[in-house]
């Protein structure tokens, strides 16, 4: 699940130039009047994961954008890795923030940015401006054309490609100006807790933790139950389940893991039931026990790692 969710951070030529991230989100943007609830949940989750990152951060929300700004020095890689574990984020953009002044000042900042990031490289590029603050004296298309021309003059090794450029230099003009060109992929999905809580039947295989990850990605908090049957299942097997739960919890938030001693039930079924039906009867009782725990803990659904047509073990 982890490798599926979080792509490696792309190379940034000079990480020290970045003190902030613009956070892009996907599905939340199509919500209606309650969109702010999902945005607030996402902001809270971002704040929570950044508590474990070296450095101090301020997370703000502004007109369809979420910004993470570092106050002083911080661990860049650690911050990116933490944000890549937050469901609801589709993109993490390292940004340079400058004060909103005139066009000449903006041009100077953009030239410095391109020099640091792509100086000497044969790249195709385009400039994309979003002028949210209409008080800026030039329109978006005008800014794109003028900055594109200046980049060509300053960096003759670069060429324009407005259809499939190697680099898109984004400029967002708001209360301040945000400059960025890299978009680090996030896991997507919905913010945790926006769709209730469910109980995961967790085993030592790969299917159930992946199922838990996929449901958590839809905004569902996860609890888990594991059926332990010593001496037929070892302590090592139980520890493997605990380790898997920790891996899922890196994305889903804290997981309450319920460990059920299943030995007596398993032996009773073995003694009393037809042996060709043992597997399905044991699974039936696992479902019943998981359902009872789910009802007692406020979980609204059960999650399993089963596939249609799969042979049970």
Feature roles, as predicted:
Residues 146-151, 157, 188-195, 262, ...:
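Active-site adenylate/phosphate-handling loop in enzymes that bind or generate adenylated species
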Residues 205:
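Conserved G/P- and acidic residue-centered "switch" motifs that form tight phosphate/ATP-binding loops
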Residues 1-2:
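Short linear segments in intrinsically disordered or otherwise low-structure-confidence regions
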Residues 259:
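Conserved residues in the N-terminal Rossmann fold of short-chain dehydrogenase/reductase
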């Amino acid at each position: 699940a982890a490798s599926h969710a979080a792509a490696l951070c792309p190379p940034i030529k000079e990480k020290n130039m970045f003190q902030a991230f613009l956070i892009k989100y996907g599905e939340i943007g199509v919500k209606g009047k309650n969109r702010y609830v999902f945005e607030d949940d996402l902001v809270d989750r971002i704040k929570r994961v950044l508590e474990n990152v070296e450095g101090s951060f301020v997370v703000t929300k502004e007109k369809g954008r979420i910004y993470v700004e570092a106050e002083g020095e911080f661990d860049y890689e650690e911050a990116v890795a933490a944000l890549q574990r937050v469901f609801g984020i589709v993109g993490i953009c390292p940004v340079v923030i400058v004060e909103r002044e005139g066009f000449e000042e903006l041009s100077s900042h953009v030239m410095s940015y391109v020099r640091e990031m792509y100086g000497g490289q044969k790249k195709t590029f385009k400039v994309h401006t979003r002028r949210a603050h209409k008080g800026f004296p030039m329109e978006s298309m005008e800014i794109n054309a003028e900055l594109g021309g200046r980049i060509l003059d300053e960096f003759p090794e670069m060429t324009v490609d407005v259809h499939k450029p190697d680099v898109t230099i984004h400029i967002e003009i708001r209360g301040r100006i945000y400059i960025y060109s890299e978009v680090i992929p996030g896991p997507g999905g919905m913010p945790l807790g926006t769709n209730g809580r469910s109980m995961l039947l967790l085993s030592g295989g790969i299917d159930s933790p992946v199922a838990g990850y996929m449901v958590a990605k839809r905004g569902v908090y996860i609890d888990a139950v594991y059926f332990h049957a010593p001496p037929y299942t070892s302590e090592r097997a139980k520890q493997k389940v605990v380790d898997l739960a920790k891996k899922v919890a890196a994305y889903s938030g804290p997981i309450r893991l319920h460990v059920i001693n299943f030995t007596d039930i398993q032996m009773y079924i073995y003694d009393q039931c037809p042996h060709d039906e043992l597997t399905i009867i044991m699974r039936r009782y696992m479902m019943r026990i998981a359902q009872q725990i789910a009802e007692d803990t406020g979980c609204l659904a059960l999650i399993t790692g089963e596939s249609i047509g799969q042979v049970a073990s």
